[in-house]
């Protein structure tokens, strides 16, 4: 999607990234989801009441959705925990179900849509400022936005 915007094939693109920074592109943040741990209630880490330190995941198989794999490998790798990723799933629900079935932990970008899939689980924040993913609209800096493009971004509230 980024090459399409850079090459003027598309005017606006929506991407999900932890820290989107593109030199030739202007970014307009749209949504931000915190990345959290989803833990079965019987798991030892479910009893914690404070954010979980990344080191506490050491030795625990983790399930993560693909869209946060780069973020997890980067942040967890600094703490030698990245190799604990046991499965990369296509969607949050699959990671949650995997954690539920195998009594382990899913690391997911949590949104309101995930609430119904986690009623029997414990949601815990992760103690690291880089544990989030954003949806951002990308626009080429050198390109003037069309009337329709401006209207769209204004309508959804990312352009004032």
Q: Where do the PLM segments sit?
A:
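Hydrophobic hinge/microswitch elements
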Residues: 1-9, 16, 68-124
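Ligand-binding clamshell of periplasmic/extracellular solute-binding protein-like
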Residues: 2-3, 17-26, 45
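Ligand-binding "clamshell"
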Residues: 21-33, 115-126, 133
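Flexible hinge/capping segments at coil-to-helix
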Residues: 24-35, 39-62
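Residues embedded in well-ordered beta-strands
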Residues: 36-38, 44, 105, 134-138
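Short helix-loop capping/hinge motifs at secondary-structure junctions, enriched
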Residues: 42-52, 70, 128-131, 142-148
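Secondary-structure junction motif
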Residues: 58-81, 145-149, 153
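A late-sequence structural motif
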Residues: 123-160
């Amino acid at each position: 999607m980024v090459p399409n915007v850079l090459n003027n094939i598309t005017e606006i693109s929506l991407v999900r990234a932890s820290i989107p920074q593109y030199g030739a592109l202007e970014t307009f943040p749209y949504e931000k989801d915190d990345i959290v741990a989803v833990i079965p209630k019987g798991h030892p880490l479910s009893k914690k009441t404070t954010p979980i330190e990344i080191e506490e995941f050491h030795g625990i198989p983790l399930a993560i959705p693909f869209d946060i794999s780069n973020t997890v490998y980067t942040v967890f790798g600094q703490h030698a925990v990245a190799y604990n990723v046991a499965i990369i799933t296509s969607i949050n629900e699959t990671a949650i179900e995997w954690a539920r079935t195998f009594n382990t932990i899913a690391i997911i970008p949590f949104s309101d849509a995930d609430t119904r899939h986690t009623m029997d689980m414990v949601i815990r924040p992760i103690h690291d400022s880089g544990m989030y993913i954003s949806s951002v609209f990308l626009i080429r800096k050198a390109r003037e936005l069309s009337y329709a493009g401006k209207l769209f971004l204004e309508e959804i509230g990312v352009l004032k």
